[in-house]
């Protein structure tokens, strides 16, 4: 394990998006003494399988899992995340948007989401802003699930490709897995959004089936 390496992991089926994503990564300020690596997984069978494949190939302590249409615009993103991890070894994963308490439905959108994000849709860009200061005085909010557009870890926990073999609920599942392993999942305090997510059109064809799996595994049978 390389304690001074940060690996960005991107599952992609669109190299133009991936190149733009990597453009922003390469313009981040890298903390002194650290190095970065970028792994792309093309045409993965599922998000979980792609992430597991890349995770096993990397020796970096810190890993940033992100969509190919996520663009990191906060130049000090890496320093901010590493600072949180080093001061709080019990924190296993950081997101930019999350829910304090997962609804019984298993759908994050059914609860208040905290954090900041520029969401770029087909015809407009929206600012999602629900400051964590409204419910905590800490510089981060402990949450039960984070949105998968960006997920930053300091420990490796396998993604549940045995259960989620498509493109939905991998993020909520991984959040629950970190909590099951005794780690905290958090959303940090932000003055401005750290990322832009070019959402485009959202496909929900497999969503309900994956939701039912999630509810059965994590909501009906909590550990």
What are these regions (language model features)?
Residues 44-58:
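Glycine-rich, basic loop-to-helix element that forms the pyrophosphate-binding segment
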Residues 67-71:
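The conserved acidic donor/metal-binding loop of glycosyltransferases
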Residues 76-117:
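Conserved donor NDP-sugar-binding/catalytic core segment of glycosyltransferases
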């Amino acid at each position: 394990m390389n304690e001074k390496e940060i690996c960005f992991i991107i599952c992609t089926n669109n190299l133009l998006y991936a190149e733009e994503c990597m453009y922003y990564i390469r313009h981040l300020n890298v903390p002194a003494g650290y190095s970065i690596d970028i792994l792309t997984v093309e045409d993965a069978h599922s998000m979980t399988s792609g992430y597991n494949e890349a995770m096993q190939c990397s020796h970096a302590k810190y890993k940033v899992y992100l969509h190919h249409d996520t663009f990191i615009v906060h130049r000090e993103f890496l320093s901010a995340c590493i600072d949180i991890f080093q001061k709080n070894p019990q924190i296993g994963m950081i997101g930019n948007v999350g829910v304090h308490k997962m609804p019984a439905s298993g759908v994050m959108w059914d609860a208040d989401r905290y954090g900041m994000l520029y969401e770029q849709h087909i015809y407009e860009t929206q600012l999602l802003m629900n400051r964590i200061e409204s419910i905590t005085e800490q510089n981060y909010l402990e949450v039960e699930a984070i949105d998968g557009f960006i997920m930053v870890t300091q420990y490796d926990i396998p993604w549940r490709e045995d259960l989620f073999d498509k493109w939905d609920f991998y993020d909520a599942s991984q959040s629950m897995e970190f909590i099951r392993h005794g780690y905290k999942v958090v959303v940090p305090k932000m003055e401005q959004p750290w990322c832009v997510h070019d959402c485009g059109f959202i496909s929900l064809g497999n969503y309900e089936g994956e939701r039912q799996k999630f509810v059965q595994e994590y909501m009906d049978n909590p550990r």
